[in-house]
Amino acid sequence: KVQLEKKLSGIYRHHVMNKKEPLVRGFDDFFMAPHSRYTEACREDILNNPKLKVLADSKEAGIYIVMAQEGKQIFVMGHPEYDRMTLDQEYKRDVKKGIMPTLPVHYYPDDDPTQRPILSWRSHANNLYTNWLNYYVYQSTPYEWH
């Protein structure tokens, strides 16, 4: 883990690095996803580990999805589960605490926190969770029909 100089907060553009993996099946070449964190995984450590496969990356937010052990371990560095208002609530909470947070990027129309945030990641998030459940949970879970 590497400490960031300031909190990474916002909606970032990501690029699919390995389109053959079922986890990213149906993803657009580029997609948006939320991040909200003070640390990041060390890029060099991930890239230099032959057991890890990077599936999606972002120039601004860093590595996003990493897989190991043929999908038995999947690491998502962002927050695709966030709803429209989650980053807004975090930002306003931190403002009230006097932390003076950076405005979440690519989130508010015209960077105006009084406006309703833009929701640009729902289809990606739904696809990610659907693929994970279908290809890495259901199809790999043994069962017997009696």
Regions found by a protein language model. Name each.
Residues 2-85:
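Pocket-forming structural segment of enzyme catalytic cores
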Residues 80-146:
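Acyltransferase
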